[in-house]
Structure formats: C-alpha cells, structure tokens
Amino acid sequence: EDTRVSLKLLNHLELKKSLVSYHEHNKAESGEKILARLLAGETCALVTDAGSPAISDPGEDLVRLCAEHGVTVCAIPGPCALVTALSISGLPTGRFTFEGFLSVNKKSRQEHLTGLKDETRTMIFYEAPHKLLATLRDLTAAFGEDRRISLCRELTKLHEEVRRMTLGEASAY
C-alpha cells in the first residue's frame, strides 16, 4: 500500500529492497508489472501497512492474479486482526463469520446487514474509526440493541483497547 510504512521496517533491519506500491487505485497497472517480474523468475514479498496481507486488503487481488497465472504464493503466518480480536472478544469462538468492511453505499450496506439478520455465529466486521458510530447505528438497526459485541482497536499495540458491551450501549457510548 504505502511504501513509506514498509520502508521504515526495512530501514530498521538495514535491508535494501526495491518497493512497488500496490493499492486500490493502481492495482491493475501495478499488478501486471509485479506479475511480469514474478513470471520472469523474480521473487517478492507481499506486505501491508497493517494487519495481514490479502485479508480485507488489496493484496487479495494480487494473490488471485498470481493464482490465475500459476505463480505459487506462500503465506508466512503472523498477526491477523480478525483472529486476534476474536480470541480476546469474550464472544463464542467455535463458529464465526468474517464480513470485512461493509460497503460505503448505504443501500448495499443495509441489504448486506439485512441478509445477516438471522446469523447466530459471531460476526467480525472491520471499520475505520471515523465511520464507527454510523456503523454501530446501522448494526443496532439490523440486529437490535441487545446483541453483545466487542469493539477492538490497536490490537497488539501500545494503546490496545477492547470494549465489551451491547450494540445499544455502544451506540450511546
């Protein structure tokens, strides 16, 4: 995504590597360039600014492109916000569904939530901080104010925060 973020880590480790930015706005062009280099025998590492590459992340499309062209993709397990959040949520972990980021289009978002109305598994959503309150209101409208939730942010970082409450309490928080 933003090469400056990865560059900090590479510089700290004193690694000199060529970086190619790959994000939502350049993925068609950058994806083809990266694929051409891989097909020519080069290797690369897919990293992301935060979280796990390809999980609610533009890297998902790059992995798909590689798979379509027979390029082997290997995962190196590491931190994953959704599993980390689930493990400390206090909610049932036996069965869950990951919904990623909801659509910014209000109608699409409401249709998606309506389709989940009867879902009994723990549901995991990602949301940007500046959209959280509106999303909590939409979730409350879809699932009712008594549904238990866990709000997790800055996981594994200095300012980690986990709040466990109902949707009604969260909307008023």
Enumerate the language-model features and the residues they cover.
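Short, acidic/turn-prone active-site loops that include or flank metal/cofactor-
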Residues: 3-4, 21-27, 79, 100-105, ...
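Class I S-adenosyl-L-methionine
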Residues: 1-76, 84
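Short, well-ordered secondary-structure micro-motifs
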Residues: 32, 57, 85-87, 109-111, ...
